[in-house]
């Protein structure tokens, strides 16, 4: 019987540093198969793929039968929860334990390709388990949704550019943007922790809290990437648990926060935007002195240090399937910190303290709609007339899409503190196709002989800026031929690969998961060690073949095929600081990949270890458990 090589089988060199390619890592075991294994490899893989399909279909039938006899849906069967246990175990870090080197076994191997010397800190939440009955809303979008019904004029850019007059602006119905709501708290309060099994549902509930009382479905259909949304709640404490001036001061005293890296000191006076960052650590007296002088304070990564912002972002990243960022802005009374500009993110402004006067402007031209890069600073003359002016008060929210020009200033007698939550940076179709075409072209060139033929000798005489207005028969014939070659580039496999690469990018961008106290007892973060009389330490593996396992989060890992290898990229070992470490990944063989495939397709429902389509089931589960990728129920 083949076995999984434990990730602790070989000591990790202290000087090693992880890299995406893994070229400077020493694998813990080398993948290998005997010749007899090679002959039956395809048949074994086919039979195991059939087993995966049967297990998924059988589980779907069970859920369907349960749905017909129950009043609620989207929850696993209760009898599978009897084995779950909960404890309030607080752990700030898990120790790295190096076991003696074992002889590599044949068959399934999992090779560690990351040299972290210690696990990252995970915040433990005291929470009660709560079932999530909502289903993920899937909404499709197309270009027809970008309409402009307003009569606002849009100034023309000073640069002479060709303009598509048929392209509409994305702002519609601007007089009806405000939603005025009496004080009201949604059912799922923003700081109420849940341990629902589906992380996408949990993320959706958190987003519902952010934009309450606007329903998520209504927002995605009518506002997302289309037009601004203003919510005025008359509830000053709605976002108060995210941060405050007192929490900012405490954060500065307890952490080594640095200018430029973490915090910018800015001002905007008489049409000039300036940055006043000194070098070194941000000390409270210095920062408050800048503030008293009329400067704005921007923090680039509050989620790293402020638990409330981290808790919000780590849940939202599961719903949006992309990096969720945040900045906070602290502005003194009667001042402005930034010039008019537009951003390359979907922006959600959450007003926490004070008041701020916002002005929004239409994109100046169609090319700026849903912008892929942020703009330079604009002058007041370049941006025209606002399409929305509003003063945000504590508890209010303002959303606007990428490309919407904006500026904000405080009003006399009131400071302002707000959080800007951002999503969907570099996450559009163009970004996906940038990943698609290089792989698709390389793949097609191997398959299609025509793509490898040399270009015609006279190509230069028919194309280029000099010949761009030519309509010769030769040019038309060449254009037709090039179009036929482009058609051959399309490949479904290349689309799968491009989406995998986009998801792999997310694994590097993502915040590490937030582990609830319920999950503590069922993951490696709540594991225990036995201290033996001879001075050795043994890790207690809390499962058998009768135990059930599931992924910690829906998006906790991504199986990727690259460099003729299968890799699992994951983010449980990420830092809260953006890209502090290189991407984390494990190299696996095809046998292990089938096990990962089953766990992904069954999520959020558990799988019995005995049903995993791998040779050594316990060792396979143990290797994923040791990296914090699965939760286990049943001893």
UniProtKB/Swiss-Prot annotation:
Q: Does the keyword Oxidoreductase apply?
A: yes
Q: Which UniProt keywords apply?
A: Chromatin regulator, Dioxygenase, Iron, Metal-binding, Nucleus, Oxidoreductase, Repressor, Transcription, Transcription regulation
Q: Which GO terms describe its molecular function?
A: 2-oxoglutarate-dependent dioxygenase activity; histone H3K36 demethylase activity; histone H3K36me/H3K36me2 demethylase activity; histone H3K4me/H3K4me2/H3K4me3 demethylase activity; iron ion binding
List residues binding Fe cation. 341, 343, 406
SUPFAM superfamilies, per the entry: Clavaminate synthase-like (SSF51197)
Report any one BP term from Gene Ontology: negative regulation of DNA-templated transcription
Q: Name one GO cellular component term.
A: nucleus
Q: Which residues form the JmjC domain?
A: 295-440
Asked whether the UniProt record includes Nucleotide-binding among its keywords, one would answer: no
- Compartments, record wording: Nucleus
Instruction: Look up the EC number in the record and give it.
Output: 1.14.11.-, 1.14.11.27
> Under which main EC class is this enzyme filed?
oxidoreductase
Matching entries from PANTHER family are given as: MINA53 MYC INDUCED NUCLEAR ANTIGEN, RIBOSOMAL OXYGENASE 1
Q: What is this protein called?
A: Bifunctional lysine-specific demethylase and histidyl-hydroxylase NO66
